[in-house]
């Protein structure tokens, strides 16, 4: 054991994964960190393996994916693992963010950790979008066309930026090549950001806890207690992932992407992967192109303002009934946006999308500060009696 505390590299591992003192009362909602690290690891390993057999060319991309599926030993397994772990990654990230919002993990002194986490989310979305283009099916081509075209909303220089991204006048071979290069690069950037996220948390006050108070009253070492606790959820994760990979590998995908990309034929509905749907719904709900793009980016960056807009004296909403109601309305609204993003742009969905978009942004900018001020006042009234 002594080498763990003296060796320059091993002592870092020791301080993060063995001796790290964690609050004794953290629940299973604090297990997402290890699960997300596992997801990133799986994605990098399967991604590099796929890259060994993939050809980033508009003529060969679709066929090279079919070659991976049919001819490469266990290629189908590697590809389905990659595709379904991507979904698992986002599902767990949304739960992780939800945990952070519920328990006030964004409040000082964890503001930096929260900010880095938001950057991680943005990089994840960029990586996922780039990866979705690579199989070069119908949804890949048209999804790439629609999303890259968003840049044309920027006044004056927009169209030039779009053509710069494309490397031509439409999505072409140059586009596919650069998307492949970036999709290969960004997961490593993501790994670096995840380390920064960990360091920012570790070097301030460590994990929070369900009570929202100091964790210093009762702590336990990370090993063996929390190693074992993390392993419980890791095994559950593998079981659920296996069910998807082996029994319904295409349940979360789009059948349209099994049709080779055809620039002459637009699919009936251009829909991104399920995990980007809420933001796609926000983008589509505003008729003005530029304002839609601004709203979509604002919806992601709104997480950054939580440390400023939450004016409550208490950390988290677990002991704040009004905030708890607001939080659950926000979650329900997010799920509604996810449904609307998959629908056609027609009458009931347009209006519903606009209401949901307003409610989503209002939660961060209006509802949270107003409700927290009301609760502060009620607490003061109750304590003065």
From Swiss-Prot:
Transmembrane helix: present as a keyword of the record? yes
Q: What are the names of the required cofactors?
A: heme b
The yes or no answer to whether the keyword GTP-binding is present is no
Q: Where in the cell is it found?
A: Mitochondrion inner membrane
Q: What does the note under cofactor report?
A: Binds 2 heme b groups non-covalently.
Record Gene3D superfamilies: Cytochrome Bc1 Complex, Chain C (1.20.810.10)
Residues annotated as transmembrane: 32-52, 76-98, 113-133, 179-199, 226-246, 290-310, 322-342, 349-369
UniProt binding sites for heme b b562? 82, 183
Q: Which PROSITE patterns match?
A: CYTB_CTER (PS51003), CYTB_NTER (PS51002)
Q: Which family does it belong to?
A: Belongs to the cytochrome b family.
Subunit comment: Fungal cytochrome b-c1 complex contains 10 subunits; 3 respiratory subunits, 2 core proteins and 5 low-molecular weight proteins. Cytochrome b-c1 complex is a homodimer.
The further comment given in this record reads: Heme 1 (or BL or b562) is low-potential and absorbs at about 562 nm, and heme 2 (or BH or b566) is high-potential and absorbs at about 566 nm.
What is the protein named?
A: Cytochrome b
């Amino acid at each position: 054991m002594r080498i763990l505390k003296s060796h320059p590299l091993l002592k870092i591992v020791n301080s993060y994964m063995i001796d790290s003192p964690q609050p004794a009362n953290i629940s299973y909602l604090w297990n997402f960190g290890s699960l997300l690290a596992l997801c990133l690891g799986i994605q990098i390993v399967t991604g590099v393996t796929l890259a060994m057999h993939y050809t980033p060319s508009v003529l060969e991309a679709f066929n090279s994916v079919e070659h991976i599926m049919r001819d490469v030993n266990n290629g189908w397994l590697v590809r389905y693992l990659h595709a379904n772990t991507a979904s698992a990654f986002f599902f767990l990230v949304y739960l992780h963010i939800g945990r952070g919002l519920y328990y006030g993990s964004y409040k000082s002194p964890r503001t930096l950790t929260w900010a880095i986490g938001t950057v991680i989310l943005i990089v994840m979305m960029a990586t996922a979008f780039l990866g979705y283009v690579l199989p070069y099916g119908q949804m890949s081509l048209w999804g790439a066309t629609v999303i890259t075209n968003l840049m044309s909303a920027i006044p004056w220089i927009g169209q030039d930026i779009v053509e710069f991204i494309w490397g031509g006048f439409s999505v072409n071979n140059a586009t596919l090549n650069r998307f492949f290069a970036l999709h290969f690069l960004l997961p490593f950037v993501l790994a670096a950001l995840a380390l920064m996220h960990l360091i920012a948390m570790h070097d301030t006050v460590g994990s929070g806890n369900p009570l929202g108070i100091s964790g210093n009253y009762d702590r336990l070492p990370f090993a063996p207690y929390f190693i074992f606790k993390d392993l419980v959820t890791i095994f559950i994760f593998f079981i659920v992932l296996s069910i998807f990979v082996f029994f319904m590998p295409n349940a979360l995908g789009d059948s349209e992407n099994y049709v080779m990309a055809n620039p002459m034929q637009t699919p009936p509905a251009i829909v991104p992967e399920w995990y980007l749907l809420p933001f796609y719904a926000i983008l589509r709900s505003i008729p003005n192109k530029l304002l839609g793009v601004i709203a979509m980016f604002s919806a992601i960056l709104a997480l950054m303002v939580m440390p400023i807009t939450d004016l409550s004296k208490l950390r988290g909403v677990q002991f704040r009934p009004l905030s708890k109601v607001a939080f659950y309305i926000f979650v329900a609204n997010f799920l509604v946006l996810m449904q609307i993003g998959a629908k056609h742009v027609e009458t009931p969905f347009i209006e519903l999308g606009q209401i949901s978009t307003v409610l989503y942004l209002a939660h961060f900018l209006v509802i949270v500060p107003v409700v927290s001020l009301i609760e502060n006042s009620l607490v003061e009234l109750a304590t003065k009696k």
